[in-house]
């Protein structure tokens, strides 16, 4: 019986997040947020171009602040789906939902209050803040490339073209970083 009570206690935050997400979606529907954003984006071509990148950054911020990717999914995915009613902008809806999912996972990954980050540092028996600061450096490089990729996706509206160009950009960035590090190591050896 004790395990039942303990298990229920562990589920309370997840249930609360879902209830708040449903409430937020209900308020958004009542206020017509989806229609407002659709009209704003529909009349402004530049807004639709940057929408996936903006949603990616919002998801990173929200997941970093709350320490949960699933809560961010529950809050932002219904909002993004409501922005694209019908079949007329299906490609942009898919790209924007992907941006939310990726941003939420990135924000959760670098958040010092995320359960996965806490468990990773505890499992590795390392200082928690050192663990957060070391993984943030790598994640921010990839996040910057993702922002460029989502801008490309907003322009071309073809997911595989954006993915391919993002991979090429990431390869170029990593190559430049590697060469810079090799040059720095060579200078230190000669000094």
Enumerate the predicted regions with their spans.
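Membrane-interface alpha-helices at helix entry/exit sites of multi-pass transporters
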Residues: 89-91, 124-139
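Transmembrane helix-loop junctions in multi-pass membrane proteins
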Residues: 25-37, 65-67, 146-160
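Membrane-embedded alpha-helical segments of transport systems
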Residues: 102-111, 135-149
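Hydrophobic alpha-helical transmembrane segments of multi-pass integral membrane proteins
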Residues: 18-21, 45-93, 100-108
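Core transmembrane alpha-helical segments of multi-pass membrane transporters/permeases
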Residues: 1-35, 49-61, 65
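Short amphipathic alpha-helical coupling elements at transmembrane boundaries
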Residues: 2-10, 35-43, 118-122, 129-133
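Membrane-interface capping segments at transmembrane-helix boundaries
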Residues: 175-188
């Amino acid at each position: 019986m004790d395990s039942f009570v303990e298990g229920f206690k562990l589920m309370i935050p997840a249930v609360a997040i879902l209830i708040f997400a449903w409430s937020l979606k209900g308020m958004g529907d009542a206020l017509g947020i989806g229609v407002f954003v659709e009209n704003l984006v529909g009349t402004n071509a530049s807004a639709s171009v940057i929408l996936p990148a903006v949603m990616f950054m919002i998801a990173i911020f929200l997941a970093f602040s709350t320490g949960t990717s699933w809560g961010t999914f529950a809050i932002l995915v219904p909002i993004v789906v409501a922005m694209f009613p019908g079949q007329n902008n299906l490609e942009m809806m898919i790209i924007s939902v992907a941006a939310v999912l990726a941003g939420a996972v990135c924000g959760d990954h670098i958040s010092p209050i995320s359960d996965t980050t806490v468990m990773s540092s505890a499992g590795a028996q390392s200082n928690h803040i050192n663990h957060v600061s070391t993984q943030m450096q790598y994640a921010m490089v990839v996040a910057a490339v993702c922002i460029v990729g989502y801008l490309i996706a907003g322009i071309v509206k073809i997911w595989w073209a954006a993915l391919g160009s993002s991979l090429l950009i990431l390869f170029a960035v990593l190559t430049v970083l590697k060469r810079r590090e090799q040059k720095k190591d060579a200078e230190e050896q000669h000094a």
